[in-house]
Amino acid sequence: MARLSQELQDYFFKEDRGPTVNLAQVLAIAKEKIFGIVLVILSLPSALPIPAPGYSTPFGVLIFLVAIQLMAGRQELWLPLSWQSKTIKTSKAQGIVKAGLPWLKRLEAIAHPRFPLVCQSRLGKILMGITVGSMAISMMIPIPGTNTLPAMSIFITGFGLQEDDGLITGAGMIFSVLIGVLMVSVIYVFFNGGITIIDILKDWLKVQFGGA
């Protein structure tokens, strides 16, 4: 199988496409690496430095479904047919893919199969499901600026999974944990006004060590 960047480039730019494409057509690229590639494709619009608007919530729901199936140890991915048949303008999809290809190629330059237990073991898939599911929920939170970083972590984790690269997958999961802490702080500030987890930790350290 060709690298994912090449598959996407061929599909969207070297073959004639109609005015619209649907999710099922794009997911046909995935073949045997369905779980990882689906995570990459669904997180990409929100993971871009300038995110494509309108995708975080619906794709977040689908990513959460993927995460549940990872935790359950499913070998075949199930997504609702009604969602698979939803269409997007080909020109819009091409714009998203074009913006994401440079990032994908950078990761491909350093990726290769290693640490297979992270991607293939039951425990590894459970941990992936937990971190990806948590980030999918974060993507759906209607607070400005809370979509991009969770989507980036899902993108990295999914990329590592489809490359069978346990190092990159593990990095994506660690990134997810760090983002989770940040997201809790952001949500706390949003609802309580101005006090972050960092401020709370500083106060706690002052009490513990007698700082001023």
From Swiss-Prot:
It is found in: Cell membrane. Its main location: membrane. It is a multi-pass membrane protein. Keywords: Cell membrane, Membrane, Transmembrane, Transmembrane helix. The chain crosses the membrane at residues 34-54, 59-79, 126-146, 171-191. One of its GO terms (cellular component) is plasma membrane. It holds the Pfam family ExoD. The keyword Nuclease does not apply. PANTHER family: EXOPOLYSACCHARIDE SYNTHESIS PROTEIN. To R.meliloti ExoD. This is Uncharacterized protein slr1875. It comes from Synechocystis sp. (strain ATCC 27184 / PCC 6803 / Kazusa).
